[in-house]
């Protein structure tokens, strides 16, 4: 058992104190990074590929380790988005503008921003190439390139998004279309899909279904809506405890769930969706819709698929406990682009960042990593405009809950955490390299027991 004094007086004291002050103390904005230009140098101690959640977080951590002038981030995008909030944007509960900030404002101060796209990785020569023909070498490489959205793998998309009845919470270009389709709904089928590929935030495709059902009830349209969730999977959720809770909600709210159904075509002009039956190859079904929410197929970024750092499926091939590459000891991976066998979420990235920080630290000292990632990930399953089931679990698909109560129950407190606390932690702590997940809070709330 860990005494309370040991928790609050150790190296996590600053973070713990900050959590206690949430809601009573304002935190200033991130320091603006003004060096948004191509690198003047062509070699860095630590080179980070990708300016998403994993890339920015690790750059902040590496800055403290080797100095800002020795760290660079390769990222072409002008804006950085907190994507988990898009579930609420698509349901009209948050504004899209609240989810994004200029990339320059989240790059750690002093870290070089190489505003370019990676076109080739050459780990045998410790260098990468960019789309402006620059060659950049490194001593340590962190790959945080995220996951690629493949709307075009569905016939009729992305051009079908020009029609007003279709939306998708997975893209900044289409998330507001979900809210428009929801508002314009009159009568008929509201269809929500889950593709036959790995996805980021695997709970999001059904979260918008629950929110839509709540919206229909709120606006008096529920009796006119036939709500359908067509998923390529064989279960509603991968962890039994939470799957059982979700099944109860599905039954109570009269939602239709069809398993092993994969969206292959959208006929937007006819308002029809075509699904293949994964259990019976060649068998298809056409369903008309009044509203369609599409979760696109996803894959590793193209630059990784043929790279030496990728496994056979195209994901960065890392050790699942240390996040160190299996073949190149000075290469590391974090987040959605890796083959880590856990759910691809921002919460997973936070937990991974603490482990990877420790891994790189000991490798820099020519030591063997001992700190191990347990696969922790979290999915706040939004089941209404004021209710969330907070799913937390590990590699074994066993619950790994932070709070000392049953998190499979719908709770207002967990919704407020999803809507307000988590964005605060993301912008003000995680991206600054000070949030490595709730493991220490779990020990505190459970009186030191794992």
UniProtKB/Swiss-Prot annotation:
The keyword Metal-binding does not apply. One of its GO terms (biological process) is sulfide oxidation, using sulfide:quinone oxidoreductase. Keywords: Acetylation, Disease variant, Disulfide bond, FAD, Flavoprotein, Mitochondrion, Oxidoreductase, Phosphoprotein, Quinone, Transit peptide. One of its GO terms (cellular component) is mitochondrial inner membrane. It comes from Homo sapiens (Human). The active site is at 201 (cysteine persulfide intermediate), 379 (cysteine persulfide intermediate). It catalyses: ubiquinone-10 + hydrogen sulfide + sulfite + 2 H(+) = ubiquinol-10 + thiosulfate; a quinone + hydrogen sulfide + glutathione + H(+) = S-sulfanylglutathione + a quinol; ubiquinone-10 + hydrogen sulfide + glutathione + H(+) = S-sulfanylglutathione + ubiquinol-10. This is Sulfide:quinone oxidoreductase, mitochondrial. The keyword Acyltransferase does not apply. The gene is SQOR. Its cofactor is FAD. Gene3D superfamilies: FAD/NAD(P)-binding domain. Belongs to the SQRD family.
């Amino acid at each position: 058992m860990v005494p309370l004094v040991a928790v609050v007086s150790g190296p996590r004291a600053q973070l713990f104190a900050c959590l206690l002050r949430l809601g009573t103390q304002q935190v200033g904005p991130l320091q603006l990074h003004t060096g948004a230009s191509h690198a003047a140098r062509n070699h860095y101690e630590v080179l980070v590929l990708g300016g998403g959640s994993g890339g920015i977080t690790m750059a902040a951590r590496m800055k403290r380790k080797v100095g800002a002038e020795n760290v660079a981030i390769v990222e072409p995008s002008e804006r950085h988005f907190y994507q988990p909030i898009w579930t609420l944007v698509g349901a009209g509960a948050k504004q899209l503008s609240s989810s994004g900030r200029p990339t320059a404002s989240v790059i750690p101060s002093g870290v070089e921003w190489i505003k370019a796209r990676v076109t080739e990785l050459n780990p045998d020569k410790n260098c990468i190439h960019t789309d402006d023909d620059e060659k950049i070498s490194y001593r340590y490489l962190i790959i945080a390139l995220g996951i690629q959205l493949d709307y075009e793998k569905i016939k009729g998309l992305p051009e079908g998004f020009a029609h007003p009845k279709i939306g998708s919470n997975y893209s900044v270009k289409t998330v507001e279309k979900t809210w428009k389709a929801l508002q314009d709904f009159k009568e008929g089928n509201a269809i929500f899909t889950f593709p036959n590929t790995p996805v980021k935030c695997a709970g999001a495709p059904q979260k918008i279904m629950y929110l839509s059902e709540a919206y229909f009830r709120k606006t008096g349209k529920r009796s006119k809506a036939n709500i359908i969730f067509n998923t390529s999977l064989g279960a509603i959720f991968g962890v039994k405890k939470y799957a059982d809770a979700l099944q109860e909600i599905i039954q109570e709210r009269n939602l239709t769930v069809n398993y092993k159904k994969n969206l292959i075509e959208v006929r937007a002009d006819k308002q029809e969706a075509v699904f293949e039956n994964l259990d019976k190859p060649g068998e298809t079904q056409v369903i008309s819709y009044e509203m369609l929410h599409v979760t696109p197929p996803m894959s590793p970024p193209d630059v990784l698929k043929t790279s030496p750092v990728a496994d056979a499926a195209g994901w960065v091939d890392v050790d699942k406990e240390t996040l160190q590459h299996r073949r190149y000891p000075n290469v590391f991976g974090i987040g959605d682009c890796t083959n880590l066998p856990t759910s691809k979420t921002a919460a997973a990235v936070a937990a991974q960042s603490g482990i990877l920080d420790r891994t790189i630290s000991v490798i820099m000292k020519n030591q063997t990593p001992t700190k191990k990632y347990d696969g922790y990930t979290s999915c706040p399953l939004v089941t209404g405009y004021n209710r969330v089931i907070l799913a937390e679990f590990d590699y074994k698909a066993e619950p790994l809950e932070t709070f000392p109560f049953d998190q499979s129950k719908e709770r207002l407190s967990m919704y407020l955490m999803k809507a307000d606390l988590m964005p605060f932690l993301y912008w003000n702590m995680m991206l600054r390299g000070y949030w490595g997940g709730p493991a220490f809070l779990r020990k505190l709330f459970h009186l030191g027991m794992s």
